[in-house]
Amino acid sequence: MPALTSQRLRRWLKPRRGWVIAVPLLWLTLFFLLPFGIVLKISLSEAAIAIPPYSAMVDFGAETLRLVVTFGNYLFLMSDSLYVSAYWGSLKIAFVSTLACLLIGYPMAYAMARAPAHWQLVLLLLVMLPSWTSFLIRVYAWMGILSNNGLINNTLLWLGLIDSPIRMMNTNFAVILGIVYAYLPFMVLPLYANLTRLDNSLLEAASDLGSRSINTFLRVTLPLSKGGIIAGSMLVFIPAVGEYVIPELLGGPDTLMIGKVLWEEFFNNRDWPVASALAMVMLGLLLIPIALFHRYQSRELKE
């Protein structure tokens, strides 16, 4: 009976396969390809005092049709040290934040995967619970904790461990701490999903052969959880590069990230072509780890 039902379902879906594919294709076109094309078009135009504030790429003359394309915005980005520093600062902070998330999240995911079954759901809820509250409220909460009159400084002053408040706000440390706190669940959940699928018989076999716990972890558990590590790192690193809210609220003038520069170019300077070029270069940088991850997944599927 189940086999007959499966055959009927396949016969029903076969002529409708095009419609099934059309739904995600339409979604991808409307919310990725179309915005991508608009941003690319603006990045190849020139700034102008107009609404919108850029020149048209296509100029309709009396008897001619002229296409105006300029790569000056991209050359300007590469020649200005401010934008190069912003890209480098974003990549550096995103990398450190991702590494910190991995160092904190892996032990958490490992402990969750090894916990009794009735505790795993509770631990999962505790990991996801902060994400159910407003992202902005959680960032503002860190402002109250890290400020000169915040919880940490007041506690240290009360204990007599410091004589004056430690400056933690408006620093790269505060930005990294905020990113780690905000994106830690995106590291823990893929790792947990990967670690729960590990074959315990491999660990038992290693133990029977006399392998110590640390050697079993390094030679069996860690290599088999590589997929979860890469997936979690991508989920943290990619949004962290373009993060705007956390650097704006917790960072200072020395915190130069591409998200803040993009905001200033779009809304303060109203230089949409340069801002669009910034976004396109950032997208190009982010496509590199995505392509590497896709290549790794393809190789794993073949093996």
Predicted segments with their positions:
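N-terminal signal-anchor/first transmembrane alpha helix
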Residues: P2-E46, A111, L121, L125
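C-terminal transmembrane helix and the adjacent membrane-cytosol boundary/short C-terminal tail
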Residues: P2-L4, R8, W19, Y192-S207, ...
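Membrane-interfacial helix termini and adjacent extracytoplasmic/periplasmic loops
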Residues: R10, G61-A62, V139-V180, I214, ...
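Interhelical loop and adjacent transmembrane-helix boundary motif
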Residues: R11-R17, A47, F60, Y74, ...
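Cytoplasmic-entry segments and transmembrane alpha-helices of multi-pass inner-membrane transporters
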Residues: V20-I21, P107-I145, L203-E204, F217-L218, ...
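Transmembrane alpha-helices
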Residues: V23, L125, L129, Y181, ...
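Short membrane-interfacial helix/loop motifs at transmembrane-helix boundaries
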Residues: L33-S81, G252-P253, E303
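Transmembrane alpha-helix signature in integral membrane proteins
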Residues: S79-R114, V180
